[in-house]
Amino acid sequence: MAPKKKVTGLIKLQIQAGQANPAPPVGPALGAHGVNIMEFCKAYNAATENQRGNVVPVEITVYEDRSFDFKLKTPPAAKLLLKAAGLQKGSGVPHTQKVGSVTMDQVKEIAQTKMEDLNANDIENAARIIAGTARSMGIEVK
C-alpha cells in the first residue's frame, strides 16, 4: 500500500453545480493552498453536471504535494425547502410571519435526499431535522 499523503488543508465551499470558475470565491480559496484552480473547476463541473441549478457543497482535501481530492455533499436543506415551497427566500421574522408551506411528504422526500449528511438514524428523525429548518425559515409544515 502506498504511503498516505500528508493533508495540508481542508476547504469547504458551496458552489452552483456545473458553474465553478476561477473567480471568487473559488479562486482565492484554492489559490491560497496552491491548488491548480482550473483542474479543480473542470473536475467539479464534470461531477455536478447532472445537478445544474442546485448549490452543491464540496469538501476539498489538499495534500502536501498540492494535489487534491474532493467530496460532494447534498444540497443545503434550506435550498431544497425553498425549491419545494416555490419561494425565493425565507421569512425575515420566521416565527411571526410565515411565507409558505410544505407538506410532510415533501419534508420526508428532502430528508431522504439529505440522509447521508444528517446526524439521524432513521428517516423520521431526519424529517424532524428538516422540519425544524423549515420552521426557522418561516415555512409552515403541514
Curated annotation (Swiss-Prot):
Keywords: Methylation, Ribonucleoprotein, Ribosomal protein, RNA-binding, rRNA-binding. One of its GO terms (biological process) is translation. GO terms for cellular component: cytosolic large ribosomal subunit. It holds the Pfam family Ribosomal_L11. It comes from the Bacteria. SUPFAM superfamilies: Ribosomal L11/L12e N-terminal domain (SSF54747), Ribosomal protein L11, C-terminal domain (SSF46906). One of its GO terms (molecular function) is structural constituent of ribosome. Transmembrane segments: none annotated. One or more lysine residues are methylated. InterPro entries: Ribosomal_uL11, Ribosomal_uL11_bac-typ, Ribosomal_uL11_C, Ribosomal_uL11_C_sf, Ribosomal_uL11_N, Ribosomal_uL11_N_sf. Belongs to the universal ribosomal protein uL11 family. Part of the ribosomal stalk of the 50S ribosomal subunit. Interacts with L10 and the large rRNA to form the base of the stalk. L10 forms an elongated spine to which L12 dimers bind in a sequential fashion forming a multimeric L10(L12)X complex. Forms part of the ribosomal stalk which helps the ribosome interact with GTP-bound translation factors. This is Large ribosomal subunit protein uL11. It comes from Corynebacterium diphtheriae (strain ATCC 700971 / NCTC 13129 / Biotype gravis). The lineage of its organism: Bacteria, Bacillati, Actinomycetota, Actinomycetes, Mycobacteriales.
